[in-house]
Amino acid sequence: MDNSYIFSYTAATLMLHETHEVIKKYLEFRDWDKTKDFVIEENVMQKQSVSSRKRVFIEIKRRVESLTSEQLEYFKDASSSDIRNLIFLAILKTYRFIFEFIVEVVLKKFLMFDYRILNSDYESFFESKKYAIEQLENITQNTEYKLKQVLFRILEESMFIDSTKNKNILKPILSNEVIELIAKDNPAFLKAFLFTDYEIEKVKERYL
């Protein structure tokens, strides 16, 4: 994972269908320019303005490019659950802030059998990051609200929480194939799928 923080995830939630369509076209063309032209012209993003289509495409491309070639190739045979989990993985790999929120807050709660995320959990996390991350120091209240709103929508659409209202934690169910793809990439990302250290060691013994 890149050590820098990127907050442009506010431009697009999980966008499961749209991201999958982009990946399919990229695997067909093997060329980002051709993929972009198709996606914009066919309005895969389902946005009225061309500028909005381009903005969302840039964000989805950034996410897709974070995946390994092996992970991308697996989309050809992946189940709907695998597709969702791999697209969520792309988000975790792209946005350090989201990854850290899950590992530093959600995983700790989950391991303590506390299965509901409170607004105060997020607010405490955000405050702890606000003065450590340059991009957050002088953001507006509106941007701060949107960062939170879109983050929880991503978690909901990833089926990581039951809803943005209740925020009950749901541990993702990963296929053996996806577990192996993550382990061969970077086993640390399994933490964001709520794997314990013990479970991660077992995965490493099996696949690495």
Predicted regions located by residue number:
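Amphipathic alpha-helical interaction surfaces
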Residues: R63-S66, E104, K108, S128-A132, ...
